[in-house]
């Protein structure tokens, strides 16, 4: 019976990661996410959607973004971009949205972008704590490699640097390895045991540790 329960627990964790808690950021079309936790961003949403969704793990995360606006000027459109902002924050199991200033024209935007005032707010419209800085690079701006720039920024210990040991949005957990037979003895293993080994091998280190804790109860 314990084996069957173990299979159910392990397979549920491995096969359905979407049930785990995470943080979602609703990203408006005026915000360009340039890097996430020293990596290229992966957002959900169509090319012409009014907003996209960025899903992050619970805990400390870092984003790099630009606020981009366009204004009518006669028959033309004039575009204004903010400096790249690098920001680090802690959040758990919530949905966040950007709270950004609005400007009536190009002049207002250029002036406001010199010291951009923005925030992230949760589902209750409470502003969360954010450490932020400008990710500045001299010279040519085209072709910038923002994930690499964020990594170098963190190594230098900037105001909005990720905590030491934090990469890809999650702090690596130190776990003790679980010792299991490398190969199942076909004469001894029943179907339940085979399923148990199958799901165990598919699990990541964190899930294996959770499973070990459960089995040892």
UniProtKB/Swiss-Prot annotation:
Signal sequence bounds: 1-21
Keyword Transcription recorded: no
Zinc-finger keyword on record: no
InterPro entries in UniProt: UPF0319
NCBIfam families: PRK04517.1
Homology family: Belongs to the UPF0319 family.
HAMAP family registered for this protein in UniProt: UPF0319
Name of the molecule in the record: UPF0319 protein VS_II0881
Origin species: Vibrio atlanticus (strain LGP32) (Vibrio splendidus (strain Mel32))
